Amino acid sequence: MVADASKGFTFQTYADDDPAAKPDVASDTEMAGFDALLGTTVIVVAHPDDEVIGFGALMQQMRKPVVVFATDGAPHDPYFWKDYGSRDAYAEVRRQEARAALAIAGAEPVFLSDHVAGGIADQELFRRLPQAAEACAKLISEIRPQALLTLSYEGGHPDHDSACFVSVVIGRQTAIPVWEAPLYHRDPDGKGAVQKFHQRSGEEVELKVEAEAMRKKVEMFHTYKSQNLVLDGFRPEIETFRPMANYDFTRRPMPWKLNYELWQWKMSGDEVAQAFADYLHSTELSGEEQRA
């Protein structure tokens, strides 16, 4: 086990796919890869509050954390914003909460909707992939990070999966290493799973949050007053990361019902995966035209 108790963090890795397995000491190679996250890192998430759940403690250790919010956090469906009067008002509340939360961790917020004509609404990222990828790639070229950190491809939310896809595309284009963290998904029996990879690779690094890091992370949680009910379902004391898995984005992440399908949202996992496939096909054609 590798630990720095003075900063409120304990790191451990697992040797196999058994979540109950005894933690191994993190190897020099594993920690060297993980250390890349502690320099200048761009964290690509879908919505304000994703970053606190997945990375609220880790970003406190980064030399220069920059968080890119890929959507404005406000869906078109009035169900989500009716208490705020309008979709725009709700989006502004979420933006201000994000600014306050990231100030606690010393991180810089970047709102991708400011860089895309017409913005990107919550639940719409998979429909705006060309615009989002272009804007995000430009930002990353300006920031020049040592690593990218994003959410897993796990079928919890179409925007989470799209943020993962965009990050992987940019990582491949730039050779910047990409790491991922889980938020939530459904198991085959339909039960919810929170902050756990649906398949372990043995490369996971678990961060146990303690002391001052925990105090700050809890303060960040409390900053997101509009998301209190959502955040109550997550554990602030654990964060888990690994190098990005080799996902096939042209297929849905799991063959069973995805979380947002069980929520009966308007999009399906097949539709989202098709959007990824269409984007990859279009960029391949564009590359061939440029080489011709």
Show which residues each predicted segment covers.
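Short, well-ordered helical secondary-structure segments
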Residues: M31, D35, P145-T150, V194-K196, ...
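A conserved mid-domain beta-alpha-beta active-site/ligand-binding segment of alpha/beta enzyme cores
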Residues: H185-M254
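Active-site cores that bind ATP or allylic diphosphates and position pyrophosphate for catalysis
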Residues: L183, G190-A193, F276, L285
